[in-house]
C-alpha cells in the first residue's frame, strides 16, 4: 500500500498530528511536493535554514517518506508514460532511506510507464527539487543520472528562486495571452 502526500508544503503542518498513527509501518508514504516560499508556501524556517523539504515533511507527519513524482509536470505524468523498453522513455528519480519502500516506489514508477532511477537516500532528494538540472526536464535514464550528479547543493536556494521566477514569467505570459482573446 502507498499513500501520496500531494498538498502544498505549508499545509503539511496543518495535518492532524495522529494522521498516520494507525497506518501500518509497511505503508509507503510518498512526498510529491515542492517548497515554493515566494509563490505559495510562505517561509518555513527549518527549510530556509537548510533542512530538506522532504525531511521537514517526514518530521511533521512523524513518518519516513520517499521523495518522488515532484520532478515531472502533471501533463508529462499523464501523457508520456510508455512501455518498458520504448526508446525515449522518460525517467523519474526516487529518493528515500528505506530500501523496501524505495523499491515499491521504483516499481510504481515503472508501472506508470517511466524508467525508475534510484536518486539515493533522502539526503540526496534536493537533487530533484525545483530548478536543479534534473527538475522537470523529461530526461531519459542516463541523462537524468548525469543531471542528478551535476546538481550543486550550495545552489539550492538559487535553483528554487530561478524556478519560481520562471513560474512567474509563465503565469504572466498566460495572463497576457488570455487578455488578447
Cite the ranges covered by each PLM segment.
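Short amphipathic alpha-helical segments
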Residues: 15-19, 41-42, 79-80, 106-107
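Rossmann-like NAD(P)-binding element
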Residues: 1-30, 34-40
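Active-site-lining helix/loop region of Rossmann-like oxidoreductase modules
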Residues: 87-181
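Rossmann-fold NAD(P)-binding glycine/threonine-rich loop
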Residues: 25-28, 32-83, 101
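Residue-level detector of anion-binding/catalytic polar loops
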Residues: 2, 64, 115
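Solvent-exposed polar/charged
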Residues: 21, 59, 107-110
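Short beta->alpha connector loops
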Residues: 8-11, 72, 98-99
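Conserved residues at beta->alpha junctions
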Residues: 6-7, 48, 96
